A protein has these predicted regions:
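Catalytic Zn2+-binding segment of zinc metalloproteases
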Residues: 170-179
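Hydrophobic helix-coil surface modules that form long, contiguous segments used
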Residues: 1-6, 11-167
């Protein structure tokens, strides 16, 4: 969501300066993976609960549910996930390590630079079909257009641009999301 769009999804005071913790429960097809701002706990087939968040602006509340293919890792105690639709699985698996390496390097640099550890728990990066923005810095669950998963040989500039977008969205965790 963007600023002032959360009101289209749920009842809220949709102002960036008003923050609240969120606890979300999702009912989705049992075969789907549910991702969001908090760590997901499967309660029963098709029922997922997302951990209560730190106080967030309303437009950061994020739920990404679908038959995702996922590559998971961990860096410095932070669970990481890279997710895309199943039809992109071979491309995601081929490119995931480069994105994990960029993500890890950014965490190391931002922790050093800002002196504040990443405060939002898990860090998922979800490549969403038909996403109308380049990317969105949702705490714990950053969304990107799925065109950033390359379907063929990528130029060095394309890889750089994706890496730059990953770094940019992560910087928002400290500048925008945390404050």
């Amino acid at each position: 969501l963007e600023v002032a769009d959360a009101r289209r999804v749920y009842a809220c005071f949709d102002q960036p300066d008003l923050k609240a913790p969120y606890t979300v429960s999702v009912t989705a097809p049992a075969a789907w993976t549910v991702l969001g701002n908090g760590a997901a706990t499967l309660l029963a087939p098709g029922r997922t609960s997302l951990a209560t968040t730190r106080p967030l602006a309303s437009y950061f509340v994020t739920i990404c549910a679908g038959p995702w293919v996922s590559v998971r890792a961990e860096h410095d105690g932070i669970p990481l996930g890279i997710h895309a639709r199943r039809s992109l699985e071979p491309h995601l698996r081929e490119q995931a390590q480069q994105m994990i390496d960029v993500t890890a390097a950014c965490f190391d640099e931002y922790h050093r630079l800002f002196g504040i550890r990443y405060p939002f728990g898990e860090y998922h990066q979800v490549f969403v079909p038909e996403f109308n923005a380049g990317a969105m810095e949702n705490p714990g669950c950053v969304t990107f257009r799925d065109q950033m998963i390359f379907r063929g040989a990528a130029t060095p500039d394309q890889v750089f641009q994706r890496s730059n977008t990953i770094a940019h969205e992560m910087a928002h965790m400290w500048f925008g999301d945390l404050v």
